[in-house]
Curated annotation (Swiss-Prot):
Nucleotidyltransferase among keywords: no
Cross-referenced InterPro entries: AAA+_ATPase (IPR003593), G_ENGA (IPR031166), GTP-bd (IPR006073), GTPase_Der (IPR016484), KH_dom-like (IPR032859), KH_dom-like_a/b (IPR015946), P-loop_NTPase (IPR027417), Small_GTP-bd (IPR005225)
Residues noted as binding GTP 2 in the record, renumbered to the chain: 186-193, 233-237, 298-301
Gene3D superfamilies for the chain: 3.30.300.20, P-loop containing nucleotide triphosphate hydrolases (3.40.50.300)
Encoding gene per record: der
Swiss-Prot/TrEMBL GO biological process terms: ribosome biogenesis
Subunit structure: Associates with the 50S ribosomal subunit.
HAMAP family with a match to the protein in the record: GTPase_Der
GO terms for MF: ATP hydrolysis activity; GTP binding; ribosome binding
UniProt name for this protein: GTPase Der
C-alpha cells in the first residue's frame, strides 16, 4: 500500500502550500468531472515510481481542551498514528514559537519518524533559519520554501526513503492466485461489517488474516460460487471470533489506501440517509485512482416506495459523475441483492482489464465520427484518424489525429459513451487521451 506522509504544524506555517505542491500532479485528473467535490485535506503525490498519500492535518494545538481546536487536534493525532513519516513544519520567518515546542514534545513520544522542516526560508542563510529550531531536539532542520519549491524535492525524497524502508514485502498481496481484490468503503454505520459477513458467512469462509503492508491492515481470502476474492483492509473492520465488527474510529487514510490497493471498490451507501459530502469525496478518490466501481445502497428493505424514489433521485443528482457504475439496492442484513452485486463486481473487473484490439477500436472511432462529427473551432475541424489501447485498469484509449486541441469536453463524453457501449465497459472509469498523429498514412486518401 502507499505510504502516508502527514503534514503537522501550528496554523499559518505553510502546510496547505506544501500540500498543494506535493499533490499538484493529481489535480487535473478530476477537474472535469461534473458534480465532484474534493476533500483537500487528503491527496496523492508521486516521485518517479513511488506514489504516496499526503495528509494536511490543519493547525495543531496539542493542548486544546474543547471546541474546534480540540477536534482538529484529535484528527491530527489520528493522522500521526496512521502516518509512516511525519513532516513537522515550522515558520522560518517568525522563528520558534511556544506552540512549536508543545508539538515537538508530543511528536517525540509517538515513535514516528519526524522530519523537521523550516518553511518560508527563501532568501535566508541556512544558519540564520535553522539555529533556533535545534532546541526542539528533532535533529537537523531542513530549510525549504513551499511557495517557491526550494528544497521540497530533496525533502520529500528523503521522507520517502524512510517511508518505503518501513514497508513490508508486498509479494503476498500481489499474488494473482488470490483472486479479485475488493475494498468495501463507506461512511461509518452504513453496514460494511454486515456486508462482509454476508459475503464470507461461516459456511463459505476460506479466510485467514494476514499482516498487510501498513499497521493493522487485514487481507481476507474467500470463495463465492467457485470464484476467489480477497477483501483488503476494510477500513475500520476487525475480526472478533468468526465475525467482523466495525471499530469505533473511521479512518480516511485507511479508506484511501484500500481503494488504491483494490481491483474493484464497492461503495456502500445507507439508503436511509442522504448522500453526504464524505460519500462524494470517497467516490471521487475511486475515480481519481481509476478503480472499477460498484455502488451498493444498503438497508433498502427499510424504505417505502416514496422513500425509495427519493433515495434514487438523490443518488442520481449527487453522484452523477459515477454514471459508469452499476447501482444495487440491497439488504446486507437479510442477504438480499448480494448475488447481483457480486456479479457486477466480476463484470466491472472484466471491463477494467479488457483488451481492446486496435482494428476494433479504430472501427468504433470511425463509426462514431461518421454518426456525429466534432464541431469546428473557427475554421478548424478536428480530424480523428485511428485509436489504440494505451493501458488497462482503467482502460486507456489513445486517439490520434489532427487539430485535437479543438475537441470539446462534450465530444469527449460522446466518444466515451460510444466506446463503453461498443466494448461493454460498464463499471470502470475510462480514460481517453488525444495525441497528434504521426501515422505516415494519416493524410493519404
Amino acid at each position: 500500500m502507499k505510504p502516508v506522509i502527514a503534514l503537522v504544524g501550528r496554523p499559518n506555517v505553510g502546510k496547505s502550500t506544501l500540500f498543494n505542491r506535493l499533490t499538484r500532479s493529481r489535480d487535473a485528473l478530476v477537474a472535469d468531472l461534473p458534480g465532484l467535490t474534493r476533500d483537500r485535506h487528503y491527496g496523492e503525490g508521486r516521485v518517479g515510481e513511488r506514489p504516496y498519500l499526503v495528509v494536511d492535518t490543519g493547525g495543531f494545538e496539542p493542548v486544546a481542551k474543547d471546541g474546534i481546536l480540540h477536534q482538529m487536534a484529535r484528527q491530527t493525532r489520528q493522522a500521526v498514528e496512521e502516518a509512516d513519516v511525519v513532516v513537522f513544519i515550522v515558520d522560518g520567518r517568525n522563528g520558534l514559537a511556544p506552540q512549536d515546542k508543545s508539538i515537538a514534545d508530543y511528536l517525540r513520544k509517538t515513535g514516528r519518524p519526524i522530519f523537521l522542516v523550516v518553511n518560508k526560508a527563501e532568501g535566508m542563510k541556512y544558519t540564520a533559519v535553522a539555529t533556533d529550531f535545534y532546541e526542539l531536539g528533532l535533529g537537523d532542520p531542513r530549510a525549504i520554501s513551499a511557495a517557491h519549491g526550494d528544497g521540497v524535492t530533496d525533502m520529500i525524497n528523503e521522507a520517502l526513503e524512510v517511508a518505503y524502508a518501513g514497508q513490508p514485502e508486498e509479494a503476498d498481496e500481489d499474488d494473482p492466485s488470490r483472486g479479485i481484490k475488493i475494498a468495501i468503503v463507506g461512511r461509518p454505520n452504513v453496514g460494511k461489517s454486515t456486508l462482509v459477513n454476508a459475503l464470507i458467512g461461516e459456511d463459505r469462509v476460506i479466510a485467514f488474516d494476514m499482516p498487510g503492508t501498513t499497521r493493522d491492515s487485514i487481507y481476507v481470502d474467500f470463495e463465492r460460487n467457485g470464484k476467489k476474492y480477497t477483501l483488503i483492509d476494510t477500513a475500520g473492520l476487525r475480526r472478533r471470533g468468526k465475525v467482523f465488527e466495525a471499530i469505533e474510529k473511521f479512518s480516511v487514510v485507511k479508506t484511501l489506501q484500500s481503494i488504491s490497493d483494490a481491483n474493484v471498490v464497492i461503495l456502500l451507501l445507507d439508503a436511509q440517509q442522504d448522500i453526504s459530502d464524505q460519500d462524494a469525496h470517497i467516490a471521487g478518490f475511486v475515480v481519481e485512482q481509476g478503480r472499477a466501481l460498484v455502488i451498493g445502497v444498503n438497508k433498502w428493505d427499510g424504505l417505502d416506495d416514496h422513500a425509495r424514489d427519493r433515495a434514487k433521485a438523490d443518488l442520481t443528482r449527487k453522484l452523477k459523475f459515477l454514471d459508469f457504475a452499476k447501482s444495487h439496492y440491497i439488504s446486507a442484513a437479510k442477504k438480499t441483492g448480494i448475488g447481483a452485486l457480486m456479479r457486477s463486481v466480476d463484470d466491472a473487473y472484466a471491463a477494467a482489464m479488457a483488451k481492446l484490439p486496435t482494428p476494433k477500436l479504430t472501427r468504433a472511432l470511425i463509426e462514431a465520427v461518421e454518426f456525429q462529427q466534432p464541431r469546428r473551432r473557427g475554421p478548424v475541424r478536428p480530424k480523428l484518424r485511428y485509436a489504440h489501447q494505451g493501458g488497462q485498469n482503467p482502460p486507456l484509449i489513445v486517439i490520434h489525429g489532427n487539430a485535437l486541441d479543438a475537441v470539446t469536453e462534450t465530444y469527449k463524453r460522446y466518444l466515451e459513451n460510444r466506446f463503453r457501449e461498443t466494448f461493454s465497459l460498464t463499471g470502470t472509469p475510462l480514460r481517453i487521451e488525444f495525441r497528434s498523429s504521426n501515422n505516415p498514412y494519416a493524410d493519404k486518401g
